[in-house]
Amino acid sequence: MSIEVRNLSKRFGQFRALNDVSLHIETGELVALLGPSGCGKTTLLRIIAGLESADNGSVLFAGEDATSVDVRQRQVGFVFQHYALFKHMTVFENVAFGLRVKHRSQRPSEDQIQRKVHDLLGLVQLDWLADRYPAQLSGGQRQRIALARALAVEPRVLLLDEPFGALDAKVRKELRRWLRRLHDELNVASVFVTHDQEEALEVADRVVLMNAGRIEQVGTPREVWEGPATPFVYGFLGDVNQLQGVASRGVWEGAGLSLPAPELAQAENQRATAYVRPHEFLYTPAAQEIIAKNYYRPIDKTVAAKYESKFPKVKLVTIDDKIFGGWRKAQKDHFSDGGTFDQIYQPQKK
């Protein structure tokens, strides 16, 4: 079932959370709402779910207006960041909960509930944990159980609010790949909120970039990465170098460069900024030689040694030691303004 929002606006006091937002999501599509904190992505998700009402605009499911439909009637599966499992219920009882609280006229028989819950636990590959309690599960297992519970009521759409935000990095990566595979089996319209750029680009069919209550760009991961529509999108999706210059009659000049800019063919001495990602630079042989052999002159200031656990033995540097820093060769094409790079320190032997 498709989801469509038209001209949604929402204020909380003087704060404008959403400003004339419109979006269409097809059945079977997995869409990421991506943006910084306070951009409106969670508010948009909650309005789609019926947990929040908009000041203006409408929400449509499969072309039918659902704006005024109660949350209990929308048939939406919702997964929260912090699982929201019932601590006093077993895994089986948590997944069965939505089925057992249905109105008597819609409630399945106990045999049907048993079969459905075991099928769902098998789907999320945790049927062997049916008799455990949430406190006995890992964070990743709890999140998969929360997803099984959301699917138990056969939702028309699936909404996930930062579903992996409370998990450690390794588990988060494993679960998001698992979610992608699972979603392909379900064929429902799914929307998930995240502030993790890598997560959105890896998992989603399309990415919706949001900022200050507005949609900045909608596109496939490749489209938003290779063709950012605004400076915000460029900056939010990764490191970028900003080169200030002037555009005139389809040519941009700045930073000692002259580049064709056909989209600015009508410009006359207009200030313009060129955006270049670090990996897009090509270095001449002379520049590569400079990068490979660039060293700092000796310094005589106090420095501190910072090291990883894989280097258990580190010699502390004293004031009289001379320090030389150089870039690793593998990093020579990953420079960006304000970024960081590894350095090799070698105290001069006395």
Swiss-Prot record:
PROSITE patterns given in the database record: ABC_TRANSPORTER_1, ABC_TRANSPORTER_2, CYSA
Swiss-Prot/TrEMBL keywords: ATP-binding, Mitochondrion, Nucleotide-binding, Plasmid, Sulfate transport, Translocase, Transport
ABC transporter domain boundaries: 3-237
Classification via PANTHER family: SPERMIDINE/PUTRESCINE IMPORT ATP-BINDING PROTEIN POTA, SPERMIDINE_PUTRESCINE IMPORT ATP-BINDING PROTEIN POTA
Record family assignment: Belongs to the ABC transporter superfamily. Sulfate/tungstate importer (TC 3.A.1.6) family.
Single GO term (MF): ATP hydrolysis activity
Function as written in the Swiss-Prot or TrEMBL entry: Part of the ABC transporter complex involved in sulfate/thiosulfate import. Responsible for energy coupling to the transport system.
Protein name: Sulfate/thiosulfate import ATP-binding protein cysA
Binding locations of ATP: G35, P36, S37, G38, C39, G40, K41, T42
The protein's Enzyme Commission number: 7.3.2.3
Compartment annotation: Mitochondrion
TM annotation in the entry: none
Cystines in this chain: none
GO cellular component: ATP-binding cassette (ABC) transporter complex; mitochondrion
Coiled coil spans: none
Pfam families in the record: ABC_tran, CysA_C_terminal
Organism: Cucumis sativus
Reaction catalysed by this enzyme: sulfate(out) + ATP + H2O = sulfate(in) + ADP + phosphate + H(+); thiosulfate(out) + ATP + H2O = thiosulfate(in) + ADP + phosphate + H(+)
